[in-house]
């Protein structure tokens, strides 16, 4: 990573712009890989997963490119006199890409439209309150909305584990295994985001914008490209999966 940073610096890209450039490249490469991988896909269900999963890094690439050129950046002057550089385009990205991630894992789990819709609604509330926490100038209000957003995230993750976990319980072993891997990616990466906000420039300012941008880039690549790679290369999507586990009702009927 440090070698890449040095090479980017030699091209005139410095500071957090290095990580924004690498984030753009990473998302574009992920998108192109998913497109190439899905060119010969004919099955309607597989196509649905490919379309959703391709859109995720495509949107993220546009967001990272806008931040790289400074279009997705603004300054917020806090009431205590501190000026914070805010990449609002990051929240625009999340407002579109996180529902698509939840749609992907919801369709994989076989969750109902109602449950997927409920989780997407919670997700949208989480992102919007997080954006309010970032843009408001009153310091106490920032932490209040951060707390609301974080509580929403905890409820979202619980809903994902409990409700989607129940929906996938009767699926075949390959589907359950893929679901568990994707669920764990969401649990780990999403849980780090509010912590990164809190210790970063938008919160306590324990880290600078350079390190904060690097952390968000790594999280985004894992949560989007890594997620998509595991999903689209799984036997649960590409076929050849094992037989579903009989439900309790089916077992009783036998």
UniProtKB/Swiss-Prot annotation:
Positions bearing the site annotation: Primary proton acceptor: 93
Protein name (Swiss-Prot/TrEMBL): Bacteriorhodopsin-I
Remaining remarks: Different protein aggregation states can be observed, leading to variations in the absorbance maxima.
Residue positions where Pyrrolidone carboxylic acid is found in the record: 7
One Pfam family hit: Bac_rhodopsin
Stated role: Light-driven proton pump. The chromophore contains 78% all-trans- and 22% 13-cis-retinal in the dark and 90% all-trans- and 10% 13-cis-retinal upon illumination with >500 nm light.
Organism placement in taxonomy: Archaea, Methanobacteriati, Methanobacteriota, Stenosarchaea group, Halobacteria
Species annotation: Haloquadratum walsbyi (strain DSM 16790 / HBSQ001)
Propiece span(s): 1-6
Name of the encoding gene: bop1
Gene Ontology CC: one annotated term: plasma membrane
PTM sites of type N6-(retinylidene)lysine: 224
Chief subcellular location: membrane
Stated family: Belongs to the archaeal/bacterial/fungal opsin family.
PTMs per UniProt: The covalent binding of retinal to the apoprotein, bacterioopsin, generates bacteriorhodopsin.
Compartments where found: Cell membrane
Transmembrane segments: 16-36, 51-71, 91-111, 116-136, 144-164, 185-205, 212-232
Membrane disposition: Multi-pass membrane protein
Keyword Transmembrane helix included in the entry's annotation: yes
Keywords: Cell membrane, Chromophore, Hydrogen ion transport, Ion transport, Membrane, Photoreceptor protein, Pyrrolidone carboxylic acid, Receptor, Retinal protein, Sensory transduction, Transmembrane, Transmembrane helix, Transport
Effect on the protein upon substituting residue 126 to A: Large spectral blue shift, but no effect on pumping activity
Gene Ontology biological process terms in this record: phototransduction; proton transmembrane transport
């Amino acid at each position: 990573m440090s070698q890449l940073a040095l090479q980017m610096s030699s091209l005139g890209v410095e500071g957090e712009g290095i990580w924004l450039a690498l984030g753009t490249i990473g998302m574009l490469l992920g998108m192109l890989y998913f497109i190439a991988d899905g060119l010969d896909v004919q099955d309607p269900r597989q196509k649905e997963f490919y379309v959703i999963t391709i859109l995720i890094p495509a949107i993220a690439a546009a967001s990272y490119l806008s931040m790289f050129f400074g279009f997705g950046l603004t300054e917020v002057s806090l009431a205590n006199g501190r000026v914070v550089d805010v990449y609002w385009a990051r929240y625009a990205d999340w407002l579109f890409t996180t529902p698509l991630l939840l749609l992907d894992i919801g369709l994989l789990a076989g969750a109902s439209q109602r449950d997927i819709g409920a989780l997407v609604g919670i997700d949208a509330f989480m992102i919007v309150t997080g954006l309010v926490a970032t843009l408001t100038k009153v310091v106490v209000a920032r932490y209040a909305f951060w707390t609301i957003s974080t509580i929403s995230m905890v409820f979202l993750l619980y809903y994902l584990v409990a409700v989607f976990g129940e929906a996938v319980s009767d699926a075949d072993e390959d589907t359950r295994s893929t679901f568990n891997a994707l669920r764990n990616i969401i649990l780990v990466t999403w849980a780090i985001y509010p912590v990164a906000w809190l210790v970063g420039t938008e919160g306590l300012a324990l880290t600078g914008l350079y390190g904060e941008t690097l952390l968000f880039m790594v999280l985004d690549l894992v949560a989007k490209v890594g997620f998509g790679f595991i999903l689209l290369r799984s036997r649960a999507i590409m076929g050849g999966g094992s037989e579903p586990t009989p439900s309790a009702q089916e077992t009783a009927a036998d």
